[in-house]
Amino acid sequence: MGDDLMRTRHGFMITAAVCTVMFMSTACTGPGEIDPSAVADVTPTPGTSEEAMPTDGAAEAADKVSAIMVQPIHDAQVVFGSDEMNHVEYELLVVNVFSDPVTLTGVTIIGADGEELGKVEGDTLAAATQSLYTHAPSPVVDASAAVSVDIDLALPTGDVPERVTHRIDYTLPDVPGAVIVDDHVVHGPEVAVDTGEAIVIAPPVAGDGWLTTSACCSPNVHRDLRLSANGLRIETAETFAVDWALVKGDRVYDGDGSSNEQFYDFGAEVLAVADGTVVAVNDGVEESIPFTSKPPETKQGFGGNQVILEIAPGVFAAYAHLQPGSITVGVGDDVEVGDVLAKLGNTGPSQGPHLHFGLLDKPDLFTGRSLPFVHEAFTVVGTVDFAALTGDELVIAPESRELTEAYPLYGVIVNFPDQ
């Protein structure tokens, strides 16, 4: 099992986009340490007594009071994207330990030799700074609150850095308590980069005109999903997961979209992306009516009807929102790449028919960690501007680029070759 899996490595402009959510996805379903040697020198605050400050050179080694604490949620992951850039993906957990709101003003990513690799600021920083669950972008961190800064560091093909560090700038309001804060800069944290090779898989659907309505790497409901696992860690189960919808012309459905049958992808065959074994199946969830998704009554219902395959040790392929009664496999069945597993549907919390697909390090849509992958080959035929979406018609910039061993980024339309 998994012998046919291939792996590849490509070598690494900072990118992000204002979070725009396509109607398809409502909720589709290591911390590091701050390096104390890297912090800036203490400058005594005017009005502070000499007795309270270190003397005789001890100030250089003293800890300093900061209004925030910053840690990485995980090591960084790398994927070669359809823009032909290497995307380094990770999240910085920022906790406000001050009595008033703190405003983040800049996150600079720094390489091992001190070179600046990228900087997140302004509107880009605002879009990338998300509350931990509610997907509310803002650079302001409320008192005693925590946010995640989602980093998408896109670098040209070349060597992938094994580690990066940061300079994080922030401001405080003019309040009396601010005098205890020694510096408005955090130097760090350091983040390890997982330079392992991305898994190469076949596509989960076939044919032309497939649009990624949610995917890595700019802000969207997949990239921004975070859940607590066992109360001990934050997991990112959908960073690289893709929601696939079929486009014809500039639309994803015919008519007014009031029925599932009007969607071009409804009933499309869902395919095994590699040889593997079925480890989980959920069926019996009824189809939703487009644009009227309701929260499920059970945890299992969040993915609607599902199939999960183990395609390699510690690598699980998850398919969700499948048509009821269409699943052709059962737990324990062995499958080969290209086998039909089910039909594309609209079950679970979904605003319209689509396929949710992703790789995980365990067979759990909530506490598994999303794994990067690339498809063997596809052609990018357009990119959708979701920010310009005002009605049923998509705003598409046409293009034609053939790619091998690449990941389809958020908003691209691709054609898959015949298998």
Language-model features, listed with the residues they occupy:
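Short histidine-centered loop motifs in beta-beta connectors
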Residues: 271, 311, 315-338
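Asparagine-centered strand-capping/turn motif at beta-strand->loop junctions
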Residues: 94-98
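Intrinsically disordered, low-complexity Pro/Gly/Ser/Thr-rich segments with frequent PxxP/GP/PP motifs
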Residues: 118-160
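Zn2+-dependent peptidoglycan hydrolase active-site motif and core
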Residues: 264, 277-323
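Terminal connector regions
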Residues: 154-199
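Bacterial signal peptide processing site
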Residues: 29-32
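Acidic, glycine-rich catalytic/binding loops that coordinate metals and/or anionic ligands
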Residues: 194-206, 211-213, 221-225, 297-301, ...
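C-terminal motif of bacterial Sec signal peptides marking the signal peptidase cleavage site
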Residues: 24-27
